[in-house]
A protein has these predicted regions:
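Hydrophobic beta-strand scaffold residues
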Residues: 29, 45, 82-83, 106-108
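N-terminal Rossmann-like NAD(P) cofactor-binding module of classical short-chain dehydrogenase/reductase
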Residues: 59-60
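Rossmann-like NAD(P)H-binding beta-loop-alpha module
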Residues: 118-133, 149
Length: 252
């Protein structure tokens, strides 16, 4: 039985995590971290990890960048593995996470969905086959409450394509102020915010006389919660290091 601490338990993903973990037999929620002390469906909630008093085998974080940064020293001091699901992290904070992984197990992915990670592999394969004759555009869509744009997932997809091509591409987020032809070595990334869109990512390979579209649509947050829970159970048994969805999928 894996004892899980949820940082951001009061948010949308926190509630979904609690509901899904309650249906499993291999893990349970022993505590939550949120803005103030309290209780959620019988689960003790604290405003700081420092109040945990040694509880838990692993942390699942769906919070905010500032909360992630505050959690890192505690996790390191208590050798507590952490699954970082929060996006919009600064380069400095991402570097701190990499450094932390030398001391404890850390799982980090911009998107915890199995399907998105399959999409990432398909994008890499498509870019390798199609080559430079196809322009690449990424369009991501989310609900209005999502703060970061473009999404971490859109950047993850762009990075996957770029790594497959030895870093040949640069990213363009806004063409409104640019009066010039499109650079063949750019990946355009556009963000849409509206309605109740959970998450939609579309990658277009635009070539001579044809367009190939690869797309993933999330219809509920359950897919992200399920991936995070599986990652937590997986990570609790690991040695220090930086892990991601590809590592976990490879060991299934």
């Amino acid at each position: 039985m894996t004892d899980i601490i949820i940082q951001g338990i009061g948010g949308r993903m926190g509630h979904v995590l609690c509901e899904m973990i309650a249906q499993r037999e291999d893990c349970r929620v022993v505590a939550g971290i949120d803005m103030k002390d309290g209780e959620l469906n019988g689960i003790p909630v604290y405003d700081s990890l420092d109040k945990l008093d040694g509880k838990g085998d692993v942390v699942i974080d769906f919070s905010a960048p500032a909360a992630v940064e505050k959690a890192l020293p505690y996790c390191e001091a208590h050798k507590l593995p952490i699954v970082v699901c929060t996006t919009g992290l600064s380069e400095e904070l991402q570097l701190k996470i990499v450094q932390l992984s030398r001391s404890i197990p850390v799982f980090k992915s911009a998107n915890m969905s199995m399907g998105i990670n399959v999409l990432s592999e398909l994008c890499k394969r498509a870019s390798a086959i199609l080559g430079a004759n196809y322009d690449i555009e990424i369009v991501e869509q989310h609900h209005p409450n999502k703060l970061d744009a473009p999404s971490g997932t859109a950047l993850m997809l762009a990075d996957a394509i770029n790594e497959e091509n030895n870093g040949a591409y640069h990213y363009v987020y806004d063409r409104s102020a640019v009066r010039q032809k499109r650079d063949p070595k750019e990946i355009g990334i556009s963000a849409v915010r509206g309605g109740s869109i959970v998450g939609d990512h579309e990658v277009l390979f635009c070539g001579p006389d044809e367009v190939i579209t690869l797309r993933h649509t999330a219809y509920s947050r359950n897919i992200f919660a399920n991936g995070a829970i599986n990652a937590a159970v997986y990570l609790a048994k690991k040695e220090p290091g930086l892990y991601n969805m590809s590592n976990m999928i490879a060991e299934m």
